[in-house]
Amino acid sequence: MRPAPLDIGNIHFVGIGGIGMSGIAEVMHNLGYTVQGSDLADSANVKRLKGLGIKVFIGQKAENLAEAQVIVVSSAIRADNPELMEARARFLPVVRRAEMLAELMRLKSCVAIGGTHGKTTTTSLVAAILDKAGLDPTVINGGIINAYGTNARLGGGEWMVVEADESDGTFVKLPATIAIVTNIDPEHLDYYGSFDAAKDAFLAFVENVPFYGAAVMCIDHPEVQALIGRVRDRRIVTYGTNPQADIRATNARVEDGFNVFDVAITDRKTGTAREMTGVRLAMHGTHNMLNSLAAIGVATQMGIADDKIRAALEGFGGVKRRFTFVGSWNDVNIYDDYGHHPVEIAAVLQAARSATKGRTIAVVQPHRYTRLHNLFDEFCACFNDADAVIVADVYEAGEKPIEGASRDALVEGLRDRGHRNVMALDGPEALPRLIAETARPGDLVVCLGAGSITYWANALPDDLAKLGGKKKAAAKSAAKTKAKPKKGRGK
């Protein structure tokens, strides 16, 4: 089966290098469609697609469409984009990214992972369990899965696992058999207009599940718990540390660099219960334990054996830019993380404290003026688990500056709320020297943000080595999130 006849002609993706667009393009290419696209920059995703034989134009202009018969766009593409304007002038079908993803999903039974945070990691964990169970899933993710070296793969099995992006509301179109909701926080309000409208969208996402499917929902999160009460006539499986959770983690601890916990599994319908003891997850942090519970909830609905679940979680290779170890210098371990929302930052810093015997040093590049402005108080309160905070200039992402939403304003806000060690970063070139002056052996440095800070993080071990001291590079497989065993705090 295919979502559309192979003879529909050339499919052109505008912004093909985006993490969501690239995954769909890769799967369609592997299905046998003629795929091409354009992007503004020659990114790692673009290079990967070119390596598969997909034609990618750098720069966007009308002539790039050539013989294209269909174009696919994401919400990031503006109405005045020259390729979109050319497609409309030629009366070509214009397909939204979520619509094309939905067409792919109709071919299989699907797990769709939604939520403000944790979608990418949870998608990867579900995929890992289905892989270990021999189900050979098709996967389209919002991040690079280290085990695949890509964010997408075409499997031969009956199941598909996809990340459901809520940013533009189109996730309500996705036909999921099993839907996960990890959490719901105020985000993307520029699209929704209000938090209530965003919550209504998540309700629609869950109610799209068919009568034979299920919604797997985090009862620990107050907004998700409230949403559970609004869902009618759909099977619900809850997870969390809450005593009422159907999939409940207890006795959580850190052992040899692993998150270790017991899982009590209760069937709400029959009342039967069982327990998985000593589950080992190769990731730090309570938030990742919760993500793994969501994946366990899916696995129990699919009847996957406990030994397969255990093996998948213990051997999980992680996701790029999710607490990724990039190297060390003078016994200072350096990590790169995508966290850019206050809830994500707080969760990453909690995980960092559990992963080190020394201090935690956070380097943050705020992402978008609007986000910093709208969540300023939350940003000023989310760094409590960092012993030192280094604040860079805001990554603009095409936005214009907003008064009071700046590097210096955040530095002042953190200090005003009692943080004892906050520094402003003059520029990326100043970071190595500042880290060298601040960090001590045994400390952990984590670079946080959705912008260019990932390049600073990956260059930091080499840049520090040039200043003197011993560097240790991350192993090729070290994109695993499992950190070095902790010997001190929190045992």
From Swiss-Prot:
Q: Which cysteines are joined by disulfide bonds?
A: none
Per the record, the GO terms for biological process are: cell division; cell wall organization; peptidoglycan biosynthetic process; regulation of cell shape
Could you list the residue ranges that cross the membrane?
Answer: none
> Could you say which residues form the signal peptide?
none
Query: Which UniProt keywords are present, listed alphabetically?
Result: ATP-binding, Cell cycle, Cell division, Cell shape, Cell wall biogenesis/degradation, Cytoplasm, Ligase, Nucleotide-binding, Peptidoglycan synthesis
**Under the cellular component aspect of Gene Ontology, which terms does the record hold?**
cytoplasm
Which EC numbers does the record give? 6.3.2.8
Which of this chain's residues are annotated to bind ATP? 115-121
**Record's catalysed reaction(s):** UDP-N-acetyl-alpha-D-muramate + L-alanine + ATP = UDP-N-acetyl-alpha-D-muramoyl-L-alanine + ADP + phosphate + H(+)
Which pathway does it operate in?
Answer: Cell wall biogenesis; peptidoglycan biosynthesis
| Matches recorded under Pfam families | Mur_ligase, Mur_ligase_C, Mur_ligase_M
Main localization (coarse): cytoplasm
Q: Which domain of life is it from?
A: Bacteria
Which molecular-function annotation in GO is an example for this chain? ATP binding
* The keyword ATP-binding belongs to this UniProt entry's keyword annotation: yes
User: NCBIfam families of this UniProt entry?
Assistant: murC
The role this protein plays is: Cell wall formation.
Family statement drawn from the similarity comment of this UniProt entry:
Belongs to the MurCDEF family.
Protein name according to UniProt: UDP-N-acetylmuramate--L-alanine ligase
Q: Which organism is it from?
A: Parvibaculum lavamentivorans (strain DS-1 / DSM 13023 / NCIMB 13966)
This chain is encoded by the gene named murC
